[in-house]
Amino acid sequence: MVVRPARNVSGSVSLPGDKSISHRYAMLAAIADGPSRMENYSTGADCASTLGCLRSLGVTWERKTGAGNVIEVQGSGLALSAPSQPLDCGNSGSTIRMLSGIVAGQKFTSEMAGDESLSRRPMERVITPLKAMGAGITSQNGRPPLRIAGGNLKGIDYRMPVASAQVKTCLLFAGLLAEGETRIEEPLRTRDHGEVALRAFGAQLERKGNEVRIRGGQRLHGIEALVPGDLSSAAFFLCAAALFPNSQLSITNLLMNPTRARLLDILMQMGLRISVTRLEEVHGELVGTLQVEGGRLKGATIAGSDTAALIDEIPVLAAIAPYTEQGIEVRDAKELRVKESDRIASIATNLRAMGAQVEEREDGLKIPGGQSLRGTELESFGDHRIAMAFSIAALRAQGETLIRGSECTAISYPEFFSTLEGLVER
């Protein structure tokens, strides 16, 4: 994909359904009693991988024709059917990690596999606690494919060594299928879509600080839901607006979950003017409309709990860092090295290719501000967030930018480039 420089960004956008919520809704709909209907389900390949795995587990679902990307799922109750072939999770770490919690509670053996990228990603973070609950799991040195012998799980008390919403959700799902109570303590508060979705489907949970408890054996009911627009996808357009002082952007039906909305705080501190209108609660998730105007772009430091809250948005924030006045420093982000690519290295490599000075660290980056970037040939590294992040950086670069392997954006946002093109002014 070739991205040409722009002179402004303006318009209105409604985003595909939030990826994190779409995964969780589909998985819970599969083990609920009765039907569920999800409108604005994510259009990305990752969430399609979840649906494909559920079909292999005997779940009946249908994509309705027409606008809205509606998925209707007929729940199977807490018991699924043994798959006749390995569950293909594609590129989706969310699918393999969260669905493993449900598969571990079934009375059959499953194999969960993925593509080359997924097969390099660490899975010990779900293997260890699921084994402690009673599941039999083998892996390739802690990486996929996973062979999971499900069975009679027992609730556990588990302190997570790494803050991960995917792992937390996996264990909550397993806890729902276990005997007794499961207590999970996370080192830092992570996004709570798993807890919110479980409550929407009728489960009872208790949360106190960084601890959440769930009692096993609860039945779920189906729901009808409009999935809010994906805030991580909105980050790219928000950062595009931040690059141009006269930009004006409206984003409708946008997820405003407090555990995800730290991005908005950071961007406002950096100088982007954001106002929220028509805020409402839908199945426990806050949803609103944003009005956005550009301004002078200051710098930021992202560390500690902010890093955990912004782990998916850091690539695009880092990509625009050279254009800020003071630059951006990212710390405590070692987790970025085990995403779809080594995102710390990918960001540093591409920024240097565009002529920027970057200090790469083991757990982050320091990117000075006040720099100009030049258009050049960049690599996506097969990573959807890297491809989209540098498409935004390219809007202010001098000359055209070619992003190789940009088709990987289909993993989370197939319509990204057409949506972006509809907002830029040249």
Regions found by a protein language model. Name each.
Residues 1-426:
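Structural preference for solvent-exposed beta-strand-turn elements
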